[in-house]
Amino acid sequence: SRGLGDVYKRQGKYYVEFDKHYKAQIKELMAQGQSEEEAKKNAPVMLEAQEMLRKWEARDPEVYSLWETMNGWVYEGFDVTYKALGVDFDKVYYESQTYLLGKSLVEEGLRKGVFYRRPDNSVWIDLTADGLDEKLLLRGDGTSVYMTQDLGTAYRRFEDNKLDDMIYVVGNEQNYHFQVLKLVLKKLGYADWSDHITHLSYGMVELPEGKMKSREGTVVDADDLIADMVATAREMSAELGKLDDCSEEEANAVSTMVGLGALKYFILKVDPRKTMLFDPRESIDFNGNTGPFIQYTHARICSILRKATEAGIDFSAAVQADYLPEEIDLVKTLTEYPSVVAAAGENFAPSVIGAYVYELAKQFNGYYHDHSILREEDAATRTMRLRLAGQVARVIRRGMNLLGIDVPERM
């Protein structure tokens, strides 16, 4: 099946051709005396693109059919890649379904005197009094821009879902755009909505080879990165003997789980607002602050509990036992989990959960290094330790699940 990478490769060829001709035409027009800004607008290939947009909005059959075909490639690729990452959506809004609503909001703004029309028929809003710039809302030929579409989409989302809050998870290069969106909605009279919009701005992810950015030529192929992560996880897990007792099917499943877990955790453990450098091999280190370290801790506890069950040890009921200071500390850490989740939600910071789960896993490993569980001779103490280990595994599993990361029971 084709993933997002195949879509980028297919469309990338067209973009390369477009970019080559576009730059050549700009250079030629500038040589004829036009400014760079004028040349960018008047380049024949750009005028053709603008004409196609006009035809698309007019539902020209040929252009609309081409658009549907190309969009089909994109959605197909999205579906494959999202499925590999374990991502799905309850509802998807398409700009093609909301831009007309956006246009009607622009007309509403004109009637209210919030927007103004320039001689070339384009529609703008002047936000200079608010410390921002003038913003284009509708082109002179009547076609929409990003802001038009986002106005319509925001309106539709609030209307459809009666939202308390709406969070946009979009890169930090769009900070200004969302300042404008909120202010425009407010000036249109939708302060109840604009006051409940949050832009969760995130920094770029960089690889040793360069930045991962979706609108520039430096984009990294998501499908290739996922495949590389799974292959690296398989290689490193095998080197450490963590797949020795696995069948081929189990080894494939564990490698996929570890590879994706490493990728997700390495990104999510960092405050989303920060730019980060992603190192694939470092992310699969079984001894550091990584997803695989936490996954291995969970699998290790599951192995202990499995062996106890196989040995006929019943630890289903609570018992009276004396707790060591380290065990009391583990219990205290476990009781912090609900407040950690609440803090992560309030601050839109999954990294808080990542840090907590890592510390819990590290704390358990230190405890288990110093104290036996299965070989403990006192039955009550052994039962208490098994139940405590089970609670640690349960919280690790829940925390990682909130991060979208699966944890294996065997490794």
Task: Annotate each PLM feature.
Residues 1, 5-411:
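Non-catalytic interaction-recognition regions
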